[in-house]
Amino acid sequence: MAGLELLSDQGYRIDGRRAGELRKIQARMGVFAQADGSAYIEQGNTKALAVVYGPHEIRGSRSRALPDRALVNCQYSSATFSTGERKRRPHGDRKSCEMGLQLRQTFEAAILTQLHPRSQIDIYVQVLQADGGTYAACVNAATLAVMDAGIPMRDFVCACSAGFVDGTALADLSHVEEAAGGPQLALALLPASGQIALLEMDSRLHEDHLEQVLEAAAQAARGVHTLLDLVVRQHVQEASVSLGD
């Protein structure tokens, strides 16, 4: 990425956004009737689909059941056509396992698991197209799917990435910005309380700049919350209308 100007002198990024500006977000809930909950989201050109099953009885060994809360199971996969590599990823490869673990940690912090002891909640997320901010898109899609399933949560959990270029914090990184290799992080936030569900850093960032980049990600995550809240309200309204017919 040598010689590629990620931020112009006028403060514009390669795709025309300002430093703290989100990519366009579009989302729908209830896209799979067979699942207990489902959602589809587009964040820029990154597209993700999430389906949720549960709470239901523990599958497999009952010894896995937790006496005081639900077991949260998250699985991540990416379509073979999701990136320009066209590389077949075996199910359960390292990246998929790491992403599944990050998603589980995120949603264990957000779901009121104590309301459903000795049960299991399954969250499956697939990335259909990857163009930066993959983890964030997965979290935001899964949040809508969990809500669609009617599973109680402490709050929305909203995620966004951020990076640092030429002394400026950039929110919601595209693939080109991620590939440039600068410092970047991903943040999952419970916006009402400000609680951090997950914070993941991909490279070193000087402590003098950490607060600035973290605030850019948090501000962007709050912007995501505003948009997801509208999606939920619209979905509830549409469901109420269809029930009334």
UniProtKB/Swiss-Prot annotation:
GO BP, one annotated term: RNA processing
SUPFAM superfamilies the record matches: Ribonuclease PH domain 2-like, Ribosomal protein S5 domain 2-like
CDD domains found in the cross-reference section: RNase_PH_RRP41 (cd11370)
Disulfide bridge partners, by residue number: none
InterPro entries named among the record's database cross-references: ExoRNase_PH_dom1 (IPR001247), ExoRNase_PH_dom2 (IPR015847), ExoRNase_PH_dom2_sf (IPR036345), PNPase/RNase_PH_dom_sf (IPR027408), Ribosomal_Su5_D2-typ_SF (IPR020568), RNase_PH (IPR050080)
Residue list for modification N-acetylalanine: A2
Keywords linked to the UniProt accession: Acetylation, Cytoplasm, Exosome, Nucleus, RNA-binding, rRNA processing
Subcellular location per the Swiss-Prot or TrEMBL entry: Cytoplasm; Nucleus, Nucleolus; Nucleus; Nucleus, Nucleoplasm
A Pfam family it matches: RNase_PH_C
Highest taxon of source: Eukaryota
GO MF annotation list: mRNA 3'-UTR AU-rich region binding
Main location (coarse class): cytoplasm
Keyword Cytoplasm belongs to the record: yes
GO cellular component, one term: nucleoplasm
Family in the record: Belongs to the RNase PH family.
Biological role stated in the UniProt entry: Non-catalytic component of the RNA exosome complex which has 3'->5' exoribonuclease activity and participates in a multitude of cellular RNA processing and degradation events. In the nucleus, the RNA exosome complex is involved in proper maturation of stable RNA species such as rRNA, snRNA and snoRNA, in the elimination of RNA processing by-products and non-coding 'pervasive' transcripts, such as antisense RNA species and promoter-upstream transcripts (PROMPTs), and of mRNAs with processing defects, thereby limiting or excluding their export to the cytoplasm.
Quaternary organization: Component of the RNA exosome core complex (Exo-9), composed of EXOSC1, EXOSC2, EXOSC3, EXOSC4, EXOSC5, EXOSC6, EXOSC7, EXOSC8 and EXOSC9; within the complex interacts with EXOSC2, EXOSC7 and EXOSC9. The catalytically inactive RNA exosome core complex (Exo-9) associates with the catalytic subunit EXOSC10/RRP6. Exo-9 may associate with DIS3 to form the nucleolar exosome complex, or DIS3L to form the cytoplasmic exosome complex.
Protein name: Exosome complex component RRP41
Organism in which the protein naturally occurs: Mus musculus
Gene name of this polypeptide: Exosc4
